[in-house]
Amino acid sequence: MTDTRKPPRKKPQRPAKPAAPREKATLHPRNRHQGHYDFAKLIKSSPELAAFVILNPYGKESIDFADPQAVRVFNRALLKAFYGIAHWDIPADYLCPPIPGRADYLHFLADLLAEDNEGVIPRGASIKALDIGTGANCIYPLLGHSDYGWQFVGSDIDSTAIAAATTIIKANGLSKAISVRQQDNRKQILLGLLDSSERFHVSLCNPPFHASLDEAQRGSQRKWRALGKADPKRKLPVLNFGGQSQELWCEGGEIGFVTRLIQESATLPSQVVWFSTLVSKASNLPPIQNALKKAGALEVKVIEMGQGQKQSRFVAWTFLDKAQRTPH
């Protein structure tokens, strides 16, 4: 007997949401920004953020990271909610950094110092850190002091950045923990900056990574295309997180800047226990490692980091042997 019943009608399927991309790398275990951002918590702390919250293609709350004002307000909320920084702002067109990645650099530096301290992370005001190119945002000193209680000296060649960083420091009552100073000679990095009696346990640096303004602008175009924001009819801001020219490019690009930093560090071998710098491209490592060999560094470390889909790294080097590197 033939079954003449019609098969049950299938319900039309709703279009599936795109699958969220799988993370290729994770943040440092001590990083405060694991997983998705708690926007309810952030908005409770900083109500102004509510106006900038959107739903991304995966149905998750986010912000438009191509909007400089949104990124600035978002950073302000993160700093207030997670680090107790109640007052933070930067001038227009200055670098507005992604905080989780900046925090990772500091956590891995803390691990590096722990290796010379019987595995214990050194904390407190006895630990001195030098932030080369601290910028108007003063982000590394703010995070490093909040997480580890370290004392910071920040340097910059830009008087506007120095003024903005000073305002942030004073507004948050951190003048005893963080100070900033201007490098008056734009051709020097460390030379002429430090007093001969000063000693630091670690230095850190986020170097300019382009060799020219044109190269920086091409990099901006690539980033905006990736964000789906490129519009050939209008002038784009230089990179989606802002940035003044001296923050983004210098003669010789990243390799040129880091090579100069290495050469100058060799003239001050005992004033900083561990020198370090971010390196934006893995392909830049061989010439940097060659420069370190020529400079006579006793030990060199390349530390890989990762934030979601982004891979990053920093190079650390020292001219001191193990016995000379005790943190206290």
From Swiss-Prot:
Region (Disordered): 1-31
Gene Ontology cellular component list: cytoplasm
Cellular compartments annotated: Cytoplasm
Catalytic activity reported: adenosine(1618) in 23S rRNA + S-adenosyl-L-methionine = N(6)-methyladenosine(1618) in 23S rRNA + S-adenosyl-L-homocysteine + H(+)
Keyword annotations: Cytoplasm, Methyltransferase, rRNA processing, S-adenosyl-L-methionine, Transferase
Keyword Transferase: yes
Gene Ontology BP annotations: rRNA base methylation
Enzyme class: transferase
Gene3D superfamilies: Vaccinia Virus protein VP39
Protein's UniProt keywords contain Protein biosynthesis: no
GO molecular function: 23S rRNA (adenine(1618)-N(6))-methyltransferase activity
EC numbers: 2.1.1.181
Functional note: Specifically methylates the adenine in position 1618 of 23S rRNA.
Similarity comment: Belongs to the methyltransferase superfamily. METTL16/RlmF family.
Name by which UniProt lists this protein: Ribosomal RNA large subunit methyltransferase F
Organism this protein belongs to: Pseudomonas savastanoi pv. phaseolicola (strain 1448A / Race 6) (Pseudomonas syringae pv. phaseolicola (strain 1448A / Race 6))
Lineage start: Bacteria, Pseudomonadati, Pseudomonadota, Gammaproteobacteria, Pseudomonadales
Gene encoding the protein: rlmF
